Amino acid sequence: MIYYSRTHIGLVRKTNEDSCFATEVDGGFFAIVADGMGGQNGGEVASSIVIETAKALLSEKSPCCLSQNDIRRLLIQANHNVLDRADRDRELKGMGSTATLVSICGMQAIIGHVGDS
């Protein structure tokens, strides 16, 4: 599979709140895009936390081993990680991120999504 990712700050924002990650492992493919909530504090931090949470899961499991439940737990854990970080840093209060991901193995794909993007 050939894949490419790129983010762009756009014409309105002062910071790029987009984060993305993609990898091929053991014949499987995983990709995730996270977009910090515009107008809130720390959108770029929130989206990077989502990506780091996904990378942590993939350090333990191949995309071919991920279940729907794993994807659900990943998104819930990412949310907890974002909220925990916001609780520890007043400047990040209210931060959040959307996330869209896909895990592909053979002819099976599992898609996860949270947010309004």
Feature locations, PLM:
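PP2C/PPM-type serine/threonine phosphatase catalytic domain
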Residues: 1-117
